[in-house]
């Protein structure tokens, strides 16, 4: 009721107002008046009925509405502005408040609804520019209300009409307010149309969800069309821009939105009051800009937007394809064509009317695409969008564009509206196939045209639209985007004639693109890694790099300021690209300082408080990673970085092959075939020539025309792959010649045309025009000639049609072709020449014309030509790809960044380097440095060493700290470079590797620069021995000072005060607190570097330190100090890492500690001491070796540095460690003893004394308490003591050292368990042997070393201690230990093998060896049970060796020891041992018989014989050193030759004769030894004396007791053993007997000096050997235990005795016979003592010899015994029988 009254009030007031208007009273408006009156009457009647309470139902709505509408329609058709305004205002209100819905059918137009008529009526009120301005505004209001009202629905043509009308008002209206309002209304309308479409799908999705889900869901969050959820761009990005007379900038991230802005819909239901509020403000308020803006603002604030619903978030939507249709319009197709002219009342010459009739372009197959929509709203949106695209494509008029022209304004506003639509595009628009197709077919083609517009506004808008497409639609527009980049953007950047404005706008756009990580990576992945696409990313970076490097602004028609601005933008883009890469790969980055992104890591004075950095950059980017919305229409390729890298490599190969082909086709083909990119078959090559567009068409033509067989085959295959079926001849020829340029040579053309003709006839065999292929061939040739003739500028007289026909007479098998056919060919060629494929020459030519541009005007002309060409190419390409579907990969993998960076790092580096080098602009420098930082980060993350090093070196170079240029040239950019370098070190330390070298070098030089800059003198540099007072006075002093600082490479020679002041000022900033802290932070932050990085860091810090210390006069210790600091900082790292660090640092300390500059070395040693003390405090677990590694530098310094000061300091440092940290030292003991070992051999008494004191303290005291910890170094301790003992300069120390070694034995003895339980590196040592290996062996070994190395008194002491230890502790030794031990002991005798001075060697043998031999025998005897099995043979071998030496004393000792050994232990010998013993003796006997004595001749006398014997002898024994000490041969039976007697003898003779003499001595000694062994202690001398006494007393009783004694080894030896000894004795006797009988030889020897005053003889040997032999035999002969051997014994006795007696008879010399006296006494006495039976056997043999003896003058004793013998013979043979004892005659003294 109320509603009806309100409606009536509106209507009646409006009708009354119309009637009241004086214009209506005119006759022509009678129909209007009547209609108004009828309507008023009806309203009154209706109100009356309602007042009376009539309940009759109202009439049908449509009749009522019809009635009400007619007067308004008539009013709108009237020419009166006031009437029209009133009518429109009422209509607007009725629609706004829902009083008119217009759903009823239109009675006047079948198939239409009333609302369509209403809208048409409103639209028709606009009659062009002359329409009243108030009416225009009312039209706009009414139309906006109609579109936005929730109560009515308008679609298709009607909605297009509303948009068109507003569009026309915008163009035609002269009122600025109306223009602006119309434009704002258009924006709002589009917003509503597209938002409704989006909401409708959302609503359907919600409706579907309701029945499915049982549980109620939380309400779907709605958002306005302007919501960021739908708009992929942030609020701050490009929006629709105002059309104002002023030039506007390209919108970018920082650009403020225009006052129109993006019209956001209001939430909630429409408030109906708003409709009325508009009317109150409808009147124009003035023409000023401000007024216009204000009114627009008011209107827009109150526009009814109730229809706009919030769109749900993207995530809640189903895929567009799956959204179900609604009953309204299941499949709405595009409506049929309508003649628009009948509907358009727009400007006559501006037909921008919107047609709903344009169907989509046919697809590639020529079939029209059915435009299928799931809802009418989608169709509305599609029609509006398509119309706007077509409007934007309309060409501008000729001549320079007029900003006020309808054409230009139309183009601009259409582009602005398109931009608005795209920016607000929702999920449906972005994914529905119809819209994507529309974008491809209409918008992209439109952009290709507008994208090269010379009008800045158009160009700028095109760029903004492209940006939006790239953001939201790149998944669908892969090929279109490629065309944009390749043909437009990059061409504009590369073309030298481009205007600054165009370049600037392109680069602004690129700035936005380059700021989006997803976009940048996607470009690389989809184009550079696609075999069929251009290398967009690479080309983009190269172009930007060239711009960033800057070129001559004059060349490009730019001012220097413009050129700098462009350069900065270029750099900004390059930096953005790298930032994107950094952001993309940030998950791989590990920041040692736990900061999130590179952006945060600034120097302290630059740090950002809110930690934005790259995140901020990301927010400002064109699109986030979410920007790629996949759709059902597109199948994306899976993102596999490795696969893309393979493709990229293949692409590079193909590109290189094409490059080669374009120079030399055969080489290119060969290369591609070798690389497997091209098949070997001619068909493959032909296909390649067809498909590869990058091939040079001229080269392709030359290749195909070549006469070689291979080329012909390729050409045939090439032509055969063309399909000419059902093609006109000229069309076929055009197709054929599109692929290449005909070669210039006639023969080549001939071959090509011939094959073409054959192929054409083959494809068109049914044709009847050509008689044969020859006809086609000739005709083709004639067409080529005709094209040249008609279209070549060189040909002046063009061929006529008649001439052409005449020329082709008779070519068809002697007949003519039809004239009309040839005529049509002529006309076609005349109209359009046969265009052969263009090469790149055209584009290259335009790019290279920059040198030829004479003026700005010429440049603009050239540019316009190029832009036209560009537009033409781009449009053609865009149309070509409009139907193509190329899969787009949305990159997700981090690994893409590595190949991306590898591709572009060089142009990037060039740009940054040149920027830093040539430009002092701080912004340029800042960008370059930021770029380098990002580049270093990427190279670091992906381990690209070459690239990383290149960038870091660039930074180092521009810091001027390492450059050869003068540091006085330092500017702000160089200071910033230093700061950047420090930041890189701080943030990327984990990855820097070898690049640390450059950084640390710079930091070192920075410290040096700071010293100069702050005026510090050389005295502050450690190591300089001089000081200077006062400030710098003049450059001479300054130069000297700097040279003193080692600044030859930093400060150029003549530095005046002014330069110095300037330098100090610039360097002053590097000394600022922030820089100092930042540098320090690198070192303190080293603790956060990872295990590998810290090693690299330390390694290069050490290298820089070495460089600092290399200055001979003024070494610096900055880096060395830092090494010490970082050692402190990093000491708590895990041991594995620390040991790797210390391996480097320790090696450095080794070198520094040996630095020739003592101050440096002292600093190093002291630092080492401090570090060591701290390190030792941490202690060490068992079996670790960290201390050992840590303390090793002390050892090295001690070994290599000969400076007493340093050596003394090292000893004191170690002593301090021992005294304070003994309890914590474990493996470090090794180093400590190694240091003392070095000190032990020093000649400086103080050093030796100090070291020995500490060593003594360790051994005697510390070992007591910490022996288990020192076990591993026990051997080193003993070795160290040994070294002290061997220092001959300090005998007291030596003796004390030996005492301490003896003391060490006590530790081993007392703590065997500790040694047994200790496990370490030698785990292969059995637990039972550890006491030996770790304890006894080192002690005994070192004692043997002392014995071998020291002087007599020390070695004697060492020998004594060694054998004392053996005797004291030997009972604990295992058998195999003894073997090791005796190997050590026998080393004592090895000394003789060394060629030393004869006197020393002699002394050695006489003393030490002697001593050792006896000691060995003592030990062996003491531990015989343990030793005999394992060592007896070794001992015998050693004794044998001694006996064989050319040292009489040693030989005697050897035999003595052998004797002692056997006598002491013989009773324990087993038969086997006796066997070994006897064999040993036999061997000694035989090897020491001096056979050479019998044959030797001096030189010249039978030299050959002599030499032969000598050689034999030398092979068996050592004759290397001859002992000529006469005193040692004093006991020889041979006379000692005087010194004079040897003088004349050659040296070789002397050696030989001395050796022989010793052998004679040994023989005698051996005989005595056997005698002693067998009969000890009954010596032969005693027995001989007793025999003599007995003979004198003439009785045999005297020696009876000897016979009964049972001493010596006789009873322990078997007969066979004794027989062996007898063999020895007999051999010796035989030899000496032979020698003594050889008078001639004895004379030769005597003359040679072998004997002094008398001839040499061997009487003693001759007699003693026989005597011993006889004693043994007679002892055995009477031994009852050997009865079984008596026969052999008797035989031996008889032989020996008879030979002896026979020999005696032959002796002539009296003295010789005298020597035999005791021998004969022995023989006869012993024979007399045997029993009668045995005596008989002997007497019968001896009798004749004894008779012969009677003739000699014998001594009385011998005669007495002989007498007894004969008497006995008489008795035994019973020659006489004594009656009484007295009858035996007394010995005759006279005989």
Curated annotation (Swiss-Prot):
Mod. after translation: In vitro phosphorylated by PKA reducing its GEF activity and dephosphorylated by phosphatase PP1.
Keywords: Acetylation, Cell projection, Cytoplasm, Cytoplasmic vesicle, Cytoskeleton, Disease variant, Endosome, Golgi apparatus, Guanine-nucleotide releasing factor, Membrane, Phosphoprotein, Protein transport, Synapse, Transport
UniProt xrefs under SUPFAM superfamilies: ARM repeat, Sec7 domain
InterPro entries found in the cross-reference section: ARM-type_fold, DCB_dom, Mon2/Sec7/BIG1-like_HDS, Mon2/Sec7/BIG1-like_HUS, Sec7/BIG1-like_C, Sec7_C_sf, Sec7_dom, Sec7_dom_sf
Modification type Phosphothreonine: residues: 244, 623, 633
Domain called SEC7: residue spans: 661-792
Region (HUS): 515-535
Region named DCB: 2-224
Bias (Basic and acidic residues): 244-257
Residue numbers carrying Phosphoserine: 214, 218, 227, 277, 355-356, 621, 624, 707, 1518, 1520-1521, 1532, 1535, 1541, 1788
Residues where N-acetylmethionine is found: 1
Tissue spec. comment: Expressed in brain (at protein level).
UniProt function note: Promotes guanine-nucleotide exchange on ARF1 and ARF3 and to a lower extent on ARF5 and ARF6. Promotes the activation of ARF1/ARF5/ARF6 through replacement of GDP with GTP. Involved in the regulation of Golgi vesicular transport. Required for the integrity of the endosomal compartment. Involved in trafficking from the trans-Golgi network (TGN) to endosomes and is required for membrane association of the AP-1 complex and GGA1. Seems to be involved in recycling of the transferrin receptor from recycling endosomes to the plasma membrane.
Family annotation (PANTHER family): BREFELDIN A-INHIBITED GUANINE NUCLEOTIDE-EXCHANGE PROTEIN 2, GUANYL-NUCLEOTIDE EXCHANGE FACTOR
Name of this protein: Brefeldin A-inhibited guanine nucleotide-exchange protein 2
Gene source species: Rattus norvegicus
């Amino acid at each position: 009721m109320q509603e009806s009254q309100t409606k009536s009030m509106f209507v009646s007031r409006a009708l009354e107002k119309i009637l009241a208007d004086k214009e209506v009273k005119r006759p022509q408006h009678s129909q209007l008046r009547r209609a108004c009156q009828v309507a008023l009457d009806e309203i009154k009647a209706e109100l009356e009925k309602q007042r009376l309470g009539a309940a009759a139902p109202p009439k049908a709505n449509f009749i009522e509405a019809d009635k009400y509408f007619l007067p308004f329609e008539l009013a709108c058709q009237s020419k009166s502005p006031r009437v029209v305004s009133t009518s429109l205002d009422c209509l607007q209100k009725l629609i706004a408040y829902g009083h008119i819905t217009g759903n009823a059918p239109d009675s006047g137009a079948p198939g239409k609804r009333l609302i369509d008529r209403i809208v048409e009526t409103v639209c028709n009120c606009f009659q062009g520019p002359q329409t009243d301005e108030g009416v225009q505004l009312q039209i706009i209001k009414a139309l906006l209300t109609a579109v936005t009202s929730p109560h009515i629905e308008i679609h298709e043509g009607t909605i297009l009409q509303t948009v068109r009308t507003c569009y026309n008002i915008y163009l035609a209206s002269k009122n600025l307010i109306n223009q602006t309002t119309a434009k704002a209304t258009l924006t709002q309308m589009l917003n509503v149309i597209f938002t409704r479409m989006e909401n409708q799908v959302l609503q359907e999705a919600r409706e579907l969800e309701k029945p499915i889900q049982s549980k109620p869901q939380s309400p779907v969050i709605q958002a306005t069309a302007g919501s960021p959820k739908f708009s992929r761009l942030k609020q701050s990005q490009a929006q629709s821009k105002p059309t104002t007379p002023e030039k506007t900038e390209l919108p970018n991230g920082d650009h403020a939105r225009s006052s129109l802005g993006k019209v956001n819909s209001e939430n909630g239901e429409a408030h109906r009051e708003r409709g009325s509020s508009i009317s109150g403000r409808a009147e124009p308020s003035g023409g000023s800009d401000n007024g216009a803006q204000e009114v627009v603002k008011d209107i827009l604030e109150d526009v009814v937007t109730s229809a706009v619903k919030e769109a749900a978030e993207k995530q809640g939507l189903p895929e567009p394809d799956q959204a179900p249709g609604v009953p309204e319009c299941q499949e709405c197709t595009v409506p049929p064509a309508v003649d628009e002219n009948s509907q358009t009342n727009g400007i006559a010459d501006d037909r921008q009317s919107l047609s709903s009739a344009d169907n989509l372009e046919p697809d590639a197959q020529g079939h029209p695409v059915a435009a299928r929509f799931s809802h009418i709203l989608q169709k509305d949106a599609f029609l509006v969008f398509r119309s706007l695209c077509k409007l934007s494509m309309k060409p501008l008029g000729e001549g320079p564009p007029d900003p006020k022209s309808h054409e230009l304004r139309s183009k601009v506003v259409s582009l602005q509206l398109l931009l608005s639509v795209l920016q607000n595009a929702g999920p449906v628009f972005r994914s529905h196939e119809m819209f994507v197709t529309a974008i491809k077919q209409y918008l992209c083609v439109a952009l290709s045209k507008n994208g090269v517009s010379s009008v800045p506004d158009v160009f700028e808008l095109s760029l903004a639209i492209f940006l939006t497409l790239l953001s939201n639609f790149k998944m669908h527009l892969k090929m279109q985007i490629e065309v944009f980049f390749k043909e437009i953007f990059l061409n504009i950047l590369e073309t030298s004639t481009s205007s600054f404005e165009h370049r600037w706008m392109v680069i602004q756009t690129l700035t936005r693109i380059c700021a989006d990580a997803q976009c940048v990576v996607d470009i690389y992945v989809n184009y550079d890694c696609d075999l069929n696409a251009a290398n967009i990313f690479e080309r983009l970076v190269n172009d930007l790099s060239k711009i960033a490097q800057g070129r001559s602004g004059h060349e490009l028609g730019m001012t220097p300021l413009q050129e700098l601005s462009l350069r900065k933008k270029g750099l900004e883009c390059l930096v953005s690209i790298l930032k994107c890469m950094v952001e993309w790969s940030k998950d791989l980055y590990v920041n040692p300082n736990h900061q999130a992104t590179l952006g945060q890591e600034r120097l302290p004075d630059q740090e950002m408080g809110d930690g934005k950095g790259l995140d901020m950059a990301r927010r400002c980017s064109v699109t986030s990673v979410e920007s790629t919305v996949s759709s059902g229409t597109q199948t994306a390729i899976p993102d596999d970085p490795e696969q893309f890298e393979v493709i990229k490599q293949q692409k590079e190969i193909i590109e290189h092959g094409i490059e080669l082909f374009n120079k030399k086709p055969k080489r290119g083909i060969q290369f591609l075939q070798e690389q497997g990119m091209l098949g070997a078959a001619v068909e493959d090559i032909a296909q390649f020539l067809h498909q590869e567009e990058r091939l040079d068409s001229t080269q392709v033509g030359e290749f195909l025309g070549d006469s070689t067989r291979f080329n012909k085959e390729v050409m045939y295959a090439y032509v055969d792959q063309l399909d000419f079926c059902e093609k006109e001849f000229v069309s076929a020829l055009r197709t054929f010649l599109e692929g290449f340029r005909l070669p210039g040579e006639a023969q080549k053309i001939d071959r090509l045309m011939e094959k073409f003709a054959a192929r054409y006839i083959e494809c068109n065999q049914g044709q009847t025009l050509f008689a044969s292929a020859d006809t086609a061939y000739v005709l083709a040739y004639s067409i080529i000639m005709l094209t040249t003739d008609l279209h070549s500028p060189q040909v002046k007289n063009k061929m006529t049609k008649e001439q052409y026909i005449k020329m082709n007479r008779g070519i068809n098998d002697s007949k003519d072709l039809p004239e009309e056919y040839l005529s049509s060919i002529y006309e076609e060629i005349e109209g359009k020449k046969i265009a052969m494929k263009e090469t790149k020459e055209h584009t290259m030519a335009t790019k290279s014309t920059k040198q030829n541009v004479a003026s700005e005007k010429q440049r603009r002309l050239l540019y316009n030509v190029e832009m036209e060409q560009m537009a033409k190419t781009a449009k053609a390409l865009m149309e070509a790809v409009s139907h193509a579907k190329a899969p787009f990969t949305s990159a997700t993998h981090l690994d893409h960044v590595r190949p991306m960076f590898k591709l572009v790092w060089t142009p990037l580096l060039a740009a940054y380097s040149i920027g830093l080098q040539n430009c002092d602009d701080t912004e340029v420098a800042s960008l370059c440095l930021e770029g380098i930082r990002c580049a270093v980060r990427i190279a670091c993350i992906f381990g690209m060493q070459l690239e990383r090093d290149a960038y870091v070196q660039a930074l180092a170079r521009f810091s001027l700290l390492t450059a050869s240029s003068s540091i006085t040239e330092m500017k702000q950019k160089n200071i910033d470079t230093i700061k950047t370098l420090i930041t890189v070190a701080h943030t990327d330390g984990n990855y820097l590797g070898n690049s640390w070298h450059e950084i640390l070098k710079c930091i070192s030089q920075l410290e040096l620069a700071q010293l100069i800059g702050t005026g510090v003198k050389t005295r502050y540099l450690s190591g300089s021995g001089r000081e200077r007072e006062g400030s710098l006075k003049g450059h001479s002093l300054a130069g000297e000072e700097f040279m003193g600082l080692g600044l030859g490479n930093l400060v150029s020679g003549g530095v005046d005060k002014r330069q110095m002041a300037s330098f100090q000022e610039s360097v002053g900033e590097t000394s600022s607190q922030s820089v100092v802290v930042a540098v320090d932070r690198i070192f303190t932050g080293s603790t956060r570097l990872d295990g590998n990085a810290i090693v690299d860091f330390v390694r290069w810090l050490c290298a820089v330190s070495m460089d600092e210390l290399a200055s001979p006069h003024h070494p610096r210790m900055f880096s060395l100090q830092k090494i010490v600091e970082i050692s402190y900082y990093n000491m708590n790292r895990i041991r594995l890492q620390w040991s790797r660090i210390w391996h480097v640092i320790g090696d450095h300390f080794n070198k520094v500690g040996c630095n020739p500059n003592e101050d440096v070395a002292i600093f190093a040693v002291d630092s080492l001491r401090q570090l060591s003390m701290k390190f030792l405090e941490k202690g060490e677990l068992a079996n670790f070796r960290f201390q050992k590694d840590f303390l090793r530098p002390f050892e090295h310094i001690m070994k290599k540095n000969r400076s007493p000061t340093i050596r003394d300091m090292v000893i004191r440092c170690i002593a301090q460690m021992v005294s304070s940290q003994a309890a914590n030292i474990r493996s470090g003991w090794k180093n400590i003893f190694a240091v003392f070992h070095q000190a032990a051999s020093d000649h400086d008494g103080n050093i030796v004394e100090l070291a020995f004191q500490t060593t003594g303290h360790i051994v005697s005291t510390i070992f007591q308490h910490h022996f288990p910890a020192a076990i591993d170094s026990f051997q080193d301790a003993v070795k160290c003591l040994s070294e002290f003992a061997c220092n001959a300069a300090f005998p007291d120390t030596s003796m004390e050292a030996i005492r301490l070694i003896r003391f060490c034995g006590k530790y081993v003895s007392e703590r065997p368990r500790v040694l047994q339980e200790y496990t370490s590196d030698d785990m292969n040592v059995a637990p039972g042997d550890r006491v030996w290996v770790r304890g006894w062996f080192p002690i005994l070994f070192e004692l043997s070393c002392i014995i071998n190395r020291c002087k007599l008194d020390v070695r004697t002491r060492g020998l004594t201690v060694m054998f004392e230890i053996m005797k004291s502790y030997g009972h604990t030794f295992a058998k195999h230990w003894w073997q090791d031990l005796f190997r050590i002991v026998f080393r004592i005798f090895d000394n003789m093998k060394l060629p030393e001075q004869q006197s020393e060697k002699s002394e050695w043998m006489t003393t030490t060896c002697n001593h050792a031999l006896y000691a060995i025998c003592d030990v062996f005897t003491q531990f015989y049970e343990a030793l005999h099995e394992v060592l007896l043979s070794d001992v015998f071998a050693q004794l044998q060796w001694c006996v064989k030496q050319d040292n009489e004393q040693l030989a005697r000792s050897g035999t003595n020891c052998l004797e002692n050994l056997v006598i002491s232990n013989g009773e324990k010998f087993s038969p086997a041992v006796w066997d070994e013993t006897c064999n040993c003796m036999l061997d000694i006997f035989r090897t020491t018989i001096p056979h050479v004595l019998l044959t030797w001749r001096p030189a010249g006398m039978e030299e050959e014989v002599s030499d032969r014997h000598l050689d034999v002898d030398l092979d068996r024994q050592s004759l290397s050193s001859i002992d000529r000490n006469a005193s040692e041969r004093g006991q020889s039976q041979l006379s000692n030759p005087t010194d004079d007697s040897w003088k004349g003898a050659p040296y070789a003779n002397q050696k030989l004769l001395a050796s022989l003499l010793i052998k004679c001595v040994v023989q005698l000694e051996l005989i005595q030894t056997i005698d002693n062994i067998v009969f000890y202690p009954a010596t032969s001398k005693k027995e001989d004396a007793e025999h003599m006494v007995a003979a004198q007393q003439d009785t045999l009783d005297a020696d009876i007791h000897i016979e009964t004694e049972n001493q010596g080894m006789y009873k322990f030896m078997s007969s066979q053993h004794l027989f062996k000894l007898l063999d020895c004795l007999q051999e010796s006797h035989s030899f000496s007997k032979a020698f003594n009988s050889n008078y001639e030889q004895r004379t030769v020897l005597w003359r040679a000096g072998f004997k002094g005053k008398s001839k040499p003889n061997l009487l003693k040997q001759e007699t003693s050997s026989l005597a011993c032999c006889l004693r043994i035999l007679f002892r055995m002969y009477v031994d009852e235990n050997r009865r079984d051997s008596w026969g052999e014994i008797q035989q031996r006795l008889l032989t020996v005795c008879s030979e002896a007696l026979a020999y005696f008879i032959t002796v002539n010399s009296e003295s010789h016979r005298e020597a035999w006296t005791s021998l004969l006494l022995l023989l006869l006495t012993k024979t007399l003592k045997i029993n009668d039976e045995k005596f008989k056997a002997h007497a019968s043999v001896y009798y004749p010899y004894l008779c012969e003896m009677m003739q000699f003058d014998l001594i009385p004793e011998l005669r007495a015994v002989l007498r007894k013998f004969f008497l006995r013979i008489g008795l035994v043979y019973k020659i006489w029988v004594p009656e009484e004892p007295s009858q035996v005659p007394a010995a005759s003294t006279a005989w």
